[in-house]
Amino acid sequence: MDLIHTFLNLIAPPFTFFFLLFFLPPFQIFKFFLSILGTLFSEDVAGKVVVITGASSGIGESLAYEYAKRGACLVLAARRERSLQEVAERARDLGSPDVVVVRADVSKAEDCRKVVDQTMNRFGRLDHLVNNAGIMSVSMLEEVEDITGYRETMDINFWGYVYMTRFAAPYLRNSRGRIVVLSSSSSWMPTPRMSFYNASKAAISQFFETLRVEFGPDIGITLVTPGFIESELTQGKFYNAGERVIDQDMRDVQVSTTPILRVESAARSIVRSAIRGERYVTEPAWFRVTYWWKLFCPEVMEWVFRLMYLASPGEPEKETFGKKVLDYTGVKSLLYPETVQVPEPKND
């Protein structure tokens, strides 16, 4: 057995290198032509049924408006019913023929089942499931006193997606529908204080990569890995040990000098990619390069993140190099939309 592994250790790397050297160029050309076909023959979602979780604000809200403009029927789910009603009203004005609001906590399996059941009772079909609900926790691991208080991050960011997908899968298979998964570039980026959030996004990315194989061509999956997008998270809304915290100084520490993309632009790109049948979408597009840095130069990425996101010894936690650049140069007004600098995110 050891001899087999020794042989593979010697043969597998050079074989893979030369295989990719000759295979990748024609394969990329093939994918380019597929993308053209996807653009020419995009899915028409008019009259189709789209379920969106976390639709009361941020990316979920803007995704609802984008689907509404295309004439889709919507089922909007979130914990804040009043905000959902406001989103639903605007979605109707934008062109959605029918909008259903369901108050639900996706961390609870029974609530996720309720969302799917009400969808089928109302429309009798389900075409797109947009798994979007999520929260962000921010804390250094060694500063966490009760680590069980961070279970909510995984309950919502991971299990909420699992529950919704499990209950919706039979109906999506019948309609040969699509799942749009709001993961994050944090699934590969080692941002300090975001270990729980990063882990939840890495878990969900791999979960849906596996489901691609299990579902095959019956259910399409578009995996979205955005950078920093205009939302309540980039307004400074965090969850620490189960408690909601509004901390824009910590937001400045965590976002640092990274430009924040306007949510309308991100939502347009996500829906456009979904109806084209694309497997992956990263917004803003330039954020894809961070994956290659992580893949080929992980040591460099770790050094940069320590420099930008961690304070020097003896300095306050929030006095990081990245935040100092924001404070002393005035570039914050160029990098952050005005909407993320409001003192209080939307709340019911």
Curated annotation (Swiss-Prot):
Transmembrane parts of this sequence: 10-30
Motif (Proline-knob): 13-26
Gene Ontology MF annotations: 11-beta-hydroxysteroid dehydrogenase (NAD+) activity; 11-beta-hydroxysteroid dehydrogenase (NADP+) activity; 17-beta-hydroxysteroid dehydrogenase (NADP+) activity; estradiol 17-beta-dehydrogenase [NAD(P)+] activity
Binding, NADP(+): 54-80, 105, 132-135, 197-201
UniProt entry keywords in alphabetical sequence: Lipid droplet, Membrane, NADP, Oxidoreductase, Signal-anchor, Transmembrane, Transmembrane helix
A Pfam family it matches: adh_short
Cell compartment(s), UniProt: Lipid droplet; Membrane
Binding site for substrate: S184
UniProt remark on domains: The proline-knob motif may be involved in the targeting to oil bodies.
Protein name: 11-beta-hydroxysteroid dehydrogenase A
Source organism of the structure: Sesamum indicum (Oriental sesame)
